[in-house]
Design a protein with these regions (language model features):
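Sequence-level preference for short, compositionally simple segments enriched
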Residues: 1-270
Length: 270
């Protein structure tokens, strides 16, 4: 709903660019969440079809301090310690056809939830970004590609519902700071993932594709992933769920040393 969005940008193909090139300098911020200044899951920004953000920060600081190094008088203390649903990015209500979100060299910051869960946009590319979150945060729409991003994970179910058709992490680095449960469980239901050239660091001890009831009719793509410098096997008790592409198959994801973003986002019907 509109009253749960701080900044609404309904127009198609709008680009927001931070003028300094330093993503820490330009901050779009809110500090409201569920039962914390809002009656519902509050969102910092709502955007439309073809939205592009570059060289800036989008954050919901309901449960995390805003530290603004360029001018410390603009620092802002979190609204509350208790973590509640406080999202950073959502779609604008009422737009039925939505595609092509692109975040480049951005910080996307919150705790519980980051992107709102929806069947739109059809495709999102998140490149060279830093993301911080707890649960139910990463991925939205049909296809989400994270390329060369860094993540700070503060809880162990970061993807929640995840994207419907594919959620790919390519050349990404994850740092974990978890509570008692040191196993990352990516998703609450069966969704397709790809992890290629990813590095996990911190206190996590292992990773599972989902919480329970593993499906036999889906395969996850994995290649060259590490945990604290050692090879990482996801869901080791269910090895048949993970497939490592051979040289020819890998061209769908990585070609001539570069990630094949064009192929991954060039979906039929889009």
């Amino acid at each position: 709903k509109n009253d749960l969005i701080g900044l609404i940008i309904p127009q198609a193909y709008i680009t927001l660019v931070g003028m300094t090139g330093n993503r820490d300098d330009v901050v779009i911020a809110s500090d409201r969440g569920q039962n914390a200044g809002a009656n519902g899951n509050f969102n910092t920004i709502g955007v439309g079809d073809g939205f592009h953000a570059k060289d800036l920060t989008i954050g919901n600081y309901c449960n995390v301090d805003l530290v603004y190094e360029r001018d410390t008088t603009k620092n802002h203390t979190k609204r509350q310690e208790a973590v509640t649903q406080a999202q950073a990015v959502t779609k604008v209500p009422g737009i039925t056809d939505m595609d092509e979100w692109f975040f480049e060299n951005c910080n996307i910051i919150s705790r519980l939830n980051l992107f709102s869960r929806d069947d739109r946009p059809k495709r999102s590319l998140i490149k060279d970004c830093h993301l911080e979150c707890t649960d139910d945060s990463l991925g939205t729409g049909y296809i989400t590609i994270f390329e060369n991003c860094t993540f700070s994970l503060f809880s162990n179910t970061p993807c929640g519902g995840a994207s419907f058709y594919m959620q790919a992490f390519l050349g990404c680095e994850f740092t974990t700071q978890l509570s008692d449960n040191k196993t990352i469980t990516l998703c609450k239901n069966t969704k397709p993932f790809a992890f290629i050239d990813c590095d996990f660091k911190g206190d996590m001890t292992g990773m599972e594709w989902k919480q329970s009831n593993f499906s036999d009719d889906i395969r996850q793509i994995v290649s060259n992933n590490t945990l604290n410098g050692q090879p990482l096997t996801i869901s080791p008790d269910y090895p048949d769920l993970s497939v490592t592409p051979d040289e020819e198959q890998m061209k769908a994801f990585k070609y001539n040393g570069e990630y094949n973003i064009y192929n991954l986002l060039n979906g039929v019907g889009y």
